[in-house]
Amino acid sequence: MSKRDYYEVLGVEKSASERDIKKAYKRLAMKYHPDRTQGDKAMEEKFKEVQEAYEILTDSQKRAAYDQYGHAGVDPNRGHGGGHGAGDFGDIFGDVFGDIFGGGRGGGRQSRAARGSDLRYNLELSLEEAVRGKSVEIRVPTLAECDTCDGSGAKKGSSAKTCTTCHGQGQVQMRQGFFAVQQACPTCGGKGKIITDPCDVCHGQGRVEKTKTLSVKVPAGVDTGDRIRLSNEGEAGENGAPAGDLYVQVHVKQHKIFERDGNNLYCEVPLSFTRAAIGGEIEVPTLEGKVKLKVTPETQTGKMFRLRNKGVKSVRSGSVGDLICKVVIETPVNLNSRQKELLQELEESMGKGKETAKNRPKESGFFDGVKKFFDDLTN
């Protein structure tokens, strides 16, 4: 089945900024996250699709390759082996032009092929953990350097020998008509060396399957979509080549009270209609504890109150966002007879018809508009 366009997956234009891409990813990651979809396999696949699109489009090199070559430009099978990393932009040129124009590309491609694959680890955090930062231990299945042969692939006491076919170059030259074509050496597979006495543990690969335990320091202020790079903590390279990197992908779980947008936090504050009418102080939650909020008299539902510097401290700039409280006026329920009497008295005290305009201007204006509408229909 053909892959969907990454921009289409995230619902953004091809010209979208990194900020737009991040906002789209955050929205879709929350929508399709397995915690919310309760084992729905189709939703799980959509979640993976969204993650893949985000990973490519927020990496400038991978995005450039994708924009020019489509999915072929970021195909992991064209890069340095394994299913964890993304494809290498340079490999496209190496495959197409390297054999024709000689060893410049070929030498580079040899080292890329031997480097360990990059890995990705999905880390879930609560909002509090993301805002405050923390150190976490993670366990990552990977290919690690073989301790028995120290990553060489050769049995202790022996070493790899220089390939006699390519004389250690990893490439051989063949003529095709007028062209001298460089190709990977068929004898050593492009490595330049041959292991004649391989290690009994790793069978000449220089690496073995292992689960590593790593400590990750999560900086305060991270958000869904942020990535933490751990250099050289990916898969070990073949036969002592450099290791890949580990990317820890952050996902912040949905909070019961707060919603986050950038460095600002939002919450809905239920308010009795009497308190909304006469005003006063109420307590509202923040991530540091409760604070007092002064409600102005005659507050209407939907009104926003901003508490400065009660949001999230930016992981990049250090500036602190705000907490925005949205008032939701609550209609009382389960009233006893006395409470109903008092409310009825209040209702009657406000008068009828035009007399209500003073205390309930919106209601009065609405019914005046309705009356005018029907008057116009009959005239």
Curated annotation (Swiss-Prot):
Binding site for Zn(2+) 2: 163, 166, 185, 188
Keyword entries, A-Z: Chaperone, Cytoplasm, DNA replication, Metal-binding, Repeat, Stress response, Zinc, Zinc-finger
Key word ATP-binding present: no
Record-level Gene Ontology MF annotations: ATP binding; heat shock protein binding; unfolded protein binding; zinc ion binding
Main subcellular location of this protein, as a coarse class: cytoplasm
GO CC terms of this entry: cytoplasm
SUPFAM superfamilies (alphabetical): Chaperone J-domain, DnaJ/Hsp40 cysteine-rich domain, HSP40/DnaJ peptide-binding domain
Subcellular location: Cytoplasm
Any one of the GO BP annotations: DNA replication
Organism superkingdom: Bacteria
Residues in CXXCXGXG motif repeats: 146-153, 163-170, 185-192, 199-206
Residues covered by the J domain: 5-70
A Pfam family hit: DnaJ_CXXCXGXG
Residues binding Zn(2+) 1, per UniProt: 146, 149, 199, 202
Cofactor binding notes: Binds 2 Zn(2+) ions per monomer.
Cofactor(s) listed: Zn(2+)
Residue spans, zinc finger CR-type: 133-211
Role, per record: Participates actively in the response to hyperosmotic and heat shock by preventing the aggregation of stress-denatured proteins and by disaggregating proteins, also in an autonomous, DnaK-independent fashion. Unfolded proteins bind initially to DnaJ; upon interaction with the DnaJ-bound protein, DnaK hydrolyzes its bound ATP, resulting in the formation of a stable complex. GrpE releases ADP from DnaK; ATP binding to DnaK triggers the release of the substrate protein, thus completing the reaction cycle.
Family: Belongs to the DnaJ family.
NCBIfam families in the record: DnaJ_bact (TIGR02349), PRK10767.1 (NF008035)
Self-association state and partner proteins as the record states: Homodimer.
Domain characteristics, as noted in the entry: The J domain is necessary and sufficient to stimulate DnaK ATPase activity. Zinc center 1 plays an important role in the autonomous, DnaK-independent chaperone activity of DnaJ. Zinc center 2 is essential for interaction with DnaK and for DnaJ activity.
Entry protein name: Chaperone protein DnaJ
Lineage of the species this protein comes from: Bacteria, Pseudomonadati, Pseudomonadota, Gammaproteobacteria, Alteromonadales
